[in-house]
Amino acid sequence: MAAKIIDGKTIAQQVRSEVAQKVQARIAAGLRAPGLAVVLVGSNPASQIYVASKRKACEEVGFVSRSYDLPETTSEAELLELIDALNADNTIDGILVQLPLPAGIDNVKVLERIHPDKDVDGFHPYNVGRLCQRAPRLRPCTPRGIVTLLERYNIDTFGLNAVVIGASNIVGRPMSMELLLAGCTTTVTHRFTKNLRHHVENADLLIVAVGKPGFIPGDWIKEGAIVIDVGINRLENGKVVGDVVFEDAAKRASYITPVPGGVGPMTVATLIENTLQACVEYHDPQGE
């Protein structure tokens, strides 16, 4: 069996085009364009690349993109003050603070300072709690992007045994909640999990998010499984690979996401979707 490739790049472009059309319709109707504030503290090269891609995506769909590039020396108090100002700014629908933050700044305190209705990353405890209670508002971008991929490929998830490898706050934990909503029987594995291979071999739907190149051998994959590889790892030779041994896994899976070009583009596309949602559902004047 040769797996069908889940083309995240193409689906992400579709999502962005749909958002762009809705933005044009808003402007034609006399409403303002959605606004996203992107905050970067310090000069981490990887963060600079991520931030640039998010700003570019914003501008492509017709959003107002506001950039705040703060020096490494920025204090926690100064950053919180900026977030307070952006919370109060009626032209800003989404606030994104790029992680990791420099030493001395409390990530949790900063993320919790963003108003839940402007938390387009979906990391605020309120939004995570809503997802847990089956009443999601703004949903974490990578898990929601993965659900969008499954939906666009008409993959029926009800009753599947889903296994999530990795229990991070950004992917693993919220992903498990999305999968419960999608009707899966869900297992989350982590560093203390015994006999990881057993869990992988029984997974109808496998989502791997650990950040270790080739962590899951292809021969562990169940015949006909759906494999979603969230890992983005750069090898010493410059090649970018996922957490799953792609060539071997693709021989056994029914569907698989490539790296690059699978989950990565969906994260940014979902950020754009979330910003439009925040604008339309939480910040537009009611009744218009």
Swiss-Prot record:
Catalytic activity entry: (6R)-5,10-methylene-5,6,7,8-tetrahydrofolate + NADP(+) = (6R)-5,10-methenyltetrahydrofolate + NADPH; (6R)-5,10-methenyltetrahydrofolate + H2O = (6R)-10-formyltetrahydrofolate + H(+)
Pathway(s) the chain acts in: One-carbon metabolism; tetrahydrofolate interconversion
Any one Pfam family match given in the protein's UniProt record, by short name: THF_DHG_CYH_C
Gene Ontology biological-process entries: L-histidine biosynthetic process; methionine biosynthetic process; purine nucleotide biosynthetic process; tetrahydrofolate interconversion
One annotated Gene Ontology cellular component of this protein: cytosol
Residues reported to bind NADP(+): 166-168, 232
Keywords carried by this UniProt record: Amino-acid biosynthesis, Histidine biosynthesis, Hydrolase, Methionine biosynthesis, Multifunctional enzyme, NADP, One-carbon metabolism, Oxidoreductase, Purine biosynthesis
GO molecular function annotations of the record: methenyltetrahydrofolate cyclohydrolase activity; methylenetetrahydrofolate dehydrogenase (NADP+) activity
E.C. code: 1.5.1.5, 3.5.4.9
InterPro entries: Aminoacid_DH-like_N_sf, NAD(P)-bd_dom_sf, THF_DH/CycHdrlase, THF_DH/CycHdrlase_cat_dom, THF_DH/CycHdrlase_CS, THF_DH/CycHdrlase_NAD-bd_dom
Stored PROSITE patterns: THF_DHG_CYH_1 (PS00766), THF_DHG_CYH_2 (PS00767)
HAMAP family: THF_DHG_CYH
Record-stated family: Belongs to the tetrahydrofolate dehydrogenase/cyclohydrolase family.
Role summary: Catalyzes the oxidation of 5,10-methylenetetrahydrofolate to 5,10-methenyltetrahydrofolate and then the hydrolysis of 5,10-methenyltetrahydrofolate to 10-formyltetrahydrofolate.
Quaternary structure and interacting proteins, as annotated: Homodimer.
Full protein name: Bifunctional protein FolD
Organism from which the protein derives: Shigella sonnei (strain Ss046)
Lineage of the species this protein comes from: Bacteria, Pseudomonadati, Pseudomonadota, Gammaproteobacteria, Enterobacterales
